[in-house]
Amino acid sequence: MFPMVTGFMNYGQQTVRAARYIGQSFMTTLSHVNRLPVTIQYPYEKLITSERFRGRIHFEFDKCIACEVCVRVCPIDLPVVDWELETNIRKKRLLNYSIDFGICIFCGNCVEYCPTNCLSMTEEYELSTYNRHELNYNQIALGRLPMSVIDDYTIRTILNSPQSLIKMVKPPLIKD
């Protein structure tokens, strides 16, 4: 008779434990009901990136001294630097500089260690193309600065959207 009583007690304890777990998960779900949605309508609304965001690399051709520090610090030896030595002035002359963003891991080492600060990170993150060879940017494409999200008149940022966060929190008043 005792095994049957202990079996009923174990069954009761397991039932209470299962009900408690279900109740905890239900309370978690209810606590998230009042939160605002995080989803944005991507092509029409964009988030403003932070100052430390690592987007596409910007390159200034006139500042580069062809020292190849960017190639040495890159974990995948990505930047391609073509230069020639001018013997009359005993300096390197930069011929071509390119980065393939299909391979780049956006670590920022090239920007950090560049002695002349000719490399910088921009806030551009839309690099999608239909052909992977279009992601190989030369010095001309790297020199173009992207349009800032804040200055782009075709994009509504989250801060300027007509449904601001304060309006979304307040429920509409219904008068009878």
Swiss-Prot record:
It comes from the Eukaryota. Its cofactor is [4Fe-4S] cluster. One of its GO terms (molecular function) is NADH dehydrogenase (ubiquinone) activity. Gene3D superfamilies: 3.30.70.3270. GO terms for cellular component: chloroplast thylakoid membrane. GO terms for biological process: photosynthesis, light reaction. NCBIfam families: ndhI, NuoI, PRK05888.1-3. NDH is composed of at least 16 different subunits, 5 of which are encoded in the nucleus. NDH shuttles electrons from NAD(P)H:plastoquinone, via FMN and iron-sulfur (Fe-S) centers, to quinones in the photosynthetic chain and possibly in a chloroplast respiratory chain. The immediate electron acceptor for the enzyme in this species is believed to be plastoquinone. Couples the redox reaction to proton translocation, and thus conserves the redox energy in a proton gradient. This is NAD(P)H-quinone oxidoreductase subunit I, chloroplastic. It comes from Populus trichocarpa (Western balsam poplar).
